[in-house]
Amino acid sequence: MTAFMVVSLVVVSQAQQTVVDKTVATVTDGVRTELITYSDLRWQLALQPNVQISPPSSEDLNRALRLLIDQRLFALEAERLPREAPTKAEITAKINEIVSYFPSSAEFERRLQAVGFKSVSDPSFEAIISERIAIDKYLAFRFRSFIVITAADEEQYYREVFIPEFRRRNKGVIIPSLQSRRTQIVEELTEQRVAQQIETFLDEAKRRAQVVILNPV
């Protein structure tokens, strides 16, 4: 590994501060290597509402690092499959979704500018969103599309989870029928199984891949 990969000597001015960017971690599957830089961590924090970014805390930086390691593992797997680049409409829709989590679009742009982007239309920012969309598509294909929820699954969840939880929260209220809550139950079961499969995938991917922390945050 070259010295450039360990510490990049790019100095950027952000919010009147001078920050030396550096490679925090590498993730490799033996064929390809993904880098995670300090800027990547700050960019991730900028996308999270109510998280301080100037200066960021060590706790938040490490939380962002764990998330980005997972994303890099997904990206390495996604690159094995043929895919079309996200469209401009998909990128715009994803940006609008992220903006909706903030008090205003102005507040979101202020956070982007604080970590070095010019606006939501900054090509570098759009490239990050494009990569996130590609990962989302991979997850939908790899996990969600193969999940089957049977009638027996629905009935068991309704009996063992939905009814006890409904009674706990709504004392004295008539319990809705399974039929009336079937869509909700299928969605909840699907999300549970997706989460379980993703957790299993990440555990296995981390055993196969090599994650090296070069500069602790």
Q: Which residues are covered by each model-predicted region?
A:
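Peptidyl-prolyl cis-trans isomerase
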Residues: 16-26, 30, 55-217
